Amino acid sequence: MRAPGHAAIRWLFWMPLVCSVAMEQLQRDPTLDYHWDLWKKTHEKEYKDKNEEEVRRLIWEKNLKFIMIHNLEYSMGMHTYQVGMNDMGDMTNEEILCRMGALRIPRQSPKTVTFRSYSNRTLPDTVDWREKGCVTEVKYQGSCGACWAFSAVGALEGQLKLKTGKLISLSAQNLVDCSNEEKYGNKGCGGGYMTEAFQYIIDNGGIEADASYPYKATDEKCHYNSKNRAATCSRYIQLPFGDEDALKEAVATKGPVSVGIDASHSSFFFYKSGVYDDPSCTGNVNHGVLVVGYGTLDGKDYWLVKNSWGLNFGDQGYIRMARNNKNHCGIASYCSYPEI
């Protein structure tokens, strides 16, 4: 049997989306016409035909309603964070996660804990590696499940700065294209895992900079050039499963740390400010991000997390996630960092 073409695949994806939206909301709100047009212009949205725009409009209205209700509840003290509309407003949760969250935990994830903790060590109350120049600018992964690659290079960028004094954006595309061999288990835009990316860099003898191997948001043939090597990795360190104290110590004493989180909720997609604490967030991680610090805001402990969804996400690309809250969203479950 011949495999379905792109048109058939698009149809199979599109029809359930249309039906789902139609069942929930049959008619758009004409009082929002101006704001819809303004939002489209702001985020440069274009649709192939009126039918697609109608469906996207209904999804946008549903998300807008969620945002308005949440912020009303926030004003009444029911939440510790605010949400706001962004460029993902015309997408369903399933679409966003399918395109942008593709963390693939190895079936037999190593259980060996290599992080050495010093329980008597005094740690600072607040850490922000951005202030020490160890964090590059926020990236945008686009419609490619390369979250794991951006998380991995982010951790290595911090180590490179601490080791050499140079802050260099490393190539996520290098990992997308070249660490997809069977022995690593990564699938490029189809997902991957940070420690497998670190292992590739170790085996390969290095990784290029983004300047010489730029991000394309698609799977391409590996064309790594050792002459352009920008960083190396000697080994990687894994933290104890679910141990927030160990994560705090690692972030405070070692640098930015790669982690996995559950990022499957509207509250996460549209986060804007405050400390993200959603009771529906689970320990089933599906998205790779980078912890670059921690602190306390209005009496609530948080992890400072760098995402790879561009500056329109969250607080200029960052989110503060609840800390010391029963491993909220699984943030301390799969943590690692590289060493040079």
Curated annotation (Swiss-Prot):
Q: Name one GO molecular function term.
A: peptidase activity
Q: Which residues are glycosylated?
A: N120
Role this protein plays: Thiol protease. Key protease responsible for the removal of the invariant chain from MHC class II molecules and MHC class II antigen presentation. The bond-specificity of this proteinase is in part similar to the specificities of cathepsin L.
Q: What is its main location?
A: other
Q: Which residues form a coiled coil?
A: none
Name this protein carries in UniProt: Cathepsin S
What keywords are assigned to this protein?
Cytoplasmic vesicle, Disulfide bond, Glycoprotein, Hydrolase, Lysosome, Protease, Secreted, Signal, Thiol protease, Zymogen
Q: Which family does it belong to?
A: Belongs to the peptidase C1 family.
Q: What tissues is it present in?
A: Widely expressed with highest expression found in non-skeletal tissues. Relatively high levels found in skeletal tissues. Expressed in spleen, B cells, dendritic cells and macrophages.
